[in-house]
Amino acid sequence: MTDLSPVLTIDGPSGAGKGTVSRIVAARLGWHYLDSGALYRAVGVAASWADLDVSDPAALVRCTFDTKVEFDEAGEAGLRVLVNGVDATGELRLETTGALASAIAAIPEVRSALKERQRAFRQPPGLVADGRDMGTVIFPDAAFKVFLTASAEERAGRRHKQLMEKGVSVIFDDLLREIMARDARDAQRVVAPLRPAEDAVLIDTSGIGIEDVVQRVVGLLDSRTP
């Protein structure tokens, strides 16, 4: 990597709060924001639209190369995502899309195909990269690395609240099982398993408000910036 723009990686399991924290921190710093999970979800959406078989790696790899993904950064409010020119933001956040993205992310060729696409987000004045392997694989030379975590029960509770507020009826125990299953898949995959980088700062977000986590992350940057 020749671009020496600073990078802050924020990794962690689903529901740990990394997306919200990353967006807020990026907006406050005036840095670019990479939601790596949205890339995998976008490929999942494109594969779903094309009615591809998730058990056909070759077809999914072709889909990865053929899918055009555009991010419309919207500050702290969120991210608008276009898949092949179509606004797919809502579909990207469906539970079914998340499960499909997790399965697709386990395919080594897909991860390889998306690696350089993710690294291209590293531009001045800096980048906040949110994902599961940002600090270990995509930006191992990042100057600032954070790993957010929380108990499975805490994360299921957060997701349950989000869905209920949107009018989506869901059973808590079902969400908990899905989160635990996804944790297992992410941790056990052969390529880029979910784990903290050795030099990452670990923050358990259980019972902590978003603003408190944001302040801790910003404080980390302030303490390490000359």
Swiss-Prot record:
Its EC number is 2.7.4.25. Keywords: ATP-binding, Cytoplasm, Kinase, Nucleotide-binding, Transferase. One of its GO terms (cellular component) is cytoplasm. The keyword Repressor does not apply. ATP binds at residues 12-20. It is found in: Cytoplasm. Pfam families: Cytidylate_kin. One of its GO terms (biological process) is pyrimidine nucleotide metabolic process. It comes from the Bacteria. GO terms for molecular function: ATP binding; CMP kinase activity; dCMP kinase activity. It catalyses: CMP + ATP = CDP + ADP; dCMP + ATP = dCDP + ADP. Belongs to the cytidylate kinase family. Type 1 subfamily. HAMAP family: Cytidyl_kinase_type1 (MF_00238). This is Cytidylate kinase. It comes from Xanthomonas campestris pv. campestris (strain B100).
